[in-house]
Amino acid sequence: MKRTYQPSKLVRKRRHGFRARMATAGGRKVIAARRAHGRKRLSA
């Protein structure tokens, strides 16, 4: 059986990167919440 996690830097950036987050209203809320929490890393 193939494992579910097949790492790819490109797919990781496209799905969870900063620009992907900023592209949607929900994603912007995620960034805002992480900023409010004082996260060192906001996105992948």
From Swiss-Prot:
One of its GO terms (biological process) is translation. It comes from the Bacteria. Keywords: Ribonucleoprotein, Ribosomal protein. GO terms for cellular component: ribonucleoprotein complex; ribosome. It comes from Methylorubrum extorquens (strain PA1). Pfam families: Ribosomal_L34. GO terms for molecular function: structural constituent of ribosome. InterPro entries: Ribosomal_bL34 (IPR000271), Ribosomal_bL34_CS (IPR020939). NCBIfam families: rpmH_bact (TIGR01030). The gene is rpmH. Belongs to the bacterial ribosomal protein bL34 family. This is Large ribosomal subunit protein bL34. Coiled coil: none annotated.
